[in-house]
Amino acid sequence: MQLSQIEREQLYAILEKYDQHPKVQEMREFIQHGDVTTYQHCKNVVLVSFWINRRFHLGADETALAVGGFLHDFYLYDWHKTSSFHGLRRLFELHGFSHPGSACVNAKRYFQITKKEQNIIQSHMWPLTFRHVPTCREAVIV
């Protein structure tokens, strides 16, 4: 599952302004899974999403797909640290439920993202994020 050199160049041209932002670079400081940083995880998600769209001719908006995929975990905290909340509130403060909202707030704070890109970010953990359902093909792909 690899993009061609031309496809990679096209993808990186879309992501360049985001990738160069200091806040995006902060994602390199946080571990996502195992020894994979949040930054590398987001990059992997974008590469796979872009590949799926191209190989299956899904016709997704590639800019929205790339931006939403790249920023989907732009939450900027160590999710392994435990919360101080208890009971039902703690359940909904758990990372799996709450991080898409945090990532979307950050993405809107530092970039002008579209409604479609917001939906990609907010719904990427659906059905855990039951209030944020994927409403576009790009969100389903991510």
Annotate each language-model stretch with its function:
Residues M1-V142:
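Metal-dependent phosphohydrolase cores
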